[in-house]
């Protein structure tokens, strides 16, 4: 499993309230910075699980990965609205676990699944 695969799996499980894999791969001193706002591991859990019924995370693609760093991009959809965005994350590792995650989000005008070989239902 790639680092990006593990990240996405942990976050998807956390969206459903299952933090076992999240706790396994995320460092106790974890910090997340999203759109310029920093939060710790416990607050991140609340944010992720609170968004679980609202957001579908689509496919992802790794831009760069080594032992201490991951940069990857993924699509997201707000389930009740026709809002789509692209998320780019810079993920730092310490002792083999995620220590810092910096994510920026950019709204995109059209559904990224249109004309592609995937659909949102595959990721719900």
Predicted regions located by residue number:
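C-terminal and inter-domain tail/linker signature
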Residues: 1-124
């Amino acid at each position: 499993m790639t680092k990006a695969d593990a990240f996405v799996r942990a976050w998807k499980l956390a969206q459903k309230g299952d933090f076992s894999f999240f706790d396994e791969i995320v460092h106790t001193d974890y910090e997340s910075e999203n759109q310029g706002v920093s939060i710790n591991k416990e607050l991140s859990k609340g944010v992720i699980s609170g968004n679980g019924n609202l957001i579908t995370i689509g496919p992802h693609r790794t831009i760069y990965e080594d032992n201490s760093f991951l940069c990857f991009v993924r699509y997201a959809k707000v389930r009740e609205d026709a809002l789509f965005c692209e998320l780019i994350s810079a993920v730092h590792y310490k002792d083999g676990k995620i220590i810092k995650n910096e994510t920026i989000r950019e709204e995109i005008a059209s559904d990224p699944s249109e004309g592609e070989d995937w659909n949102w239902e595959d990721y719900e």
